[in-house]
Amino acid sequence: MTDSLIHTGPFLVAALYHFVSVPRFASLQAPLQALSEENGVKGTLLLAHEGINGTIAGPDAGIHAVLAFLRAQPEFARLEHKESRASKMPFLRMKVKLKKEIVTMGVEDIDPNKVVGTYVAPRDWNALISDPDTIVIDTRNDYETAIGTFRGALDPKTKTFREFPDWVRRNTGLHNKPKVAMYCTGGIRCEKATAFMKAEGFDEVYHLKGGILKYLEEVPQEESLWEGACFVFDERVSVEHGLKEGEHRLCHACRNPITSEEITSPLYEEGVSCSHCYHTRTEEDRLRYRQRQLQIALARKRGQRHIGS
């Protein structure tokens, strides 16, 4: 299934994941890497026993070639993906990695291929999260929720997805309402989170199909309950309604998204510090970052891209 393009740009970006048993996943690494490189495709794909996850970008024909290869594999015949556009290549290289999990929760025996929550289409999401009997949970990390979230959602303020299970177990009040609705960027974390919640005894568990990205694509801004921008894991940094590129930039010292206002802060120095990390880094750290930033600037003058940029 291919979702429609919303924003124009020379590079096609495809976000995908699929939970499915793939005992032979390691055998797909080399052909995927070679095919991607041959077609000018960059990004990251994770392969594991439980499926595939990743985001890739490149020319239209290249992306279509990689997706066609994947769907030619019996396990991925029903693979869905979401498309958007980027004004410049958002990745530096292509990486196909073998993993224990395609999204790391760190809890044994959680299998979304066997037990999972109920999908909710973007057009039905507003009604669900507006229901007073529903607890809404953002399953993303704190640096993501800082720039955008659904109105009224609980923010676990996790640093990594591995912290989510402990947060759930500590917050016994989550059982006080009959319905739990969860969401994430593209759908993979909240899907795995629903499998965990079911295992923890929650009965009515729902998750946003296609994640925030699909919601921002399909739901008109005037009807939207989304507030802010959606963090994405590439050089676009964020996207907004209609999946157009957002205005956030990334602090390359701490990897936090920063606004245009934060760039004017006296604590901001490109590639070296921002208001999020200035007080948690040492002068030695900043000296090292300045040296890296100098190498990036020199690479730009040569018309190249530094690997650390």
From Swiss-Prot:
It catalyses: uridine(34) in tRNA + AH2 + O2 = 5-hydroxyuridine(34) in tRNA + A + H2O. One of its GO terms (biological process) is tRNA modification. The active site is at 184 (cysteine persulfide intermediate). GO terms for molecular function: oxidoreductase activity, acting on paired donors, with incorporation or reduction of molecular oxygen. Keywords: Oxidoreductase, tRNA processing. Residues 130-224 form the Rhodanese domain. It comes from the Bacteria. Belongs to the TrhO family. This is tRNA uridine(34) hydroxylase.
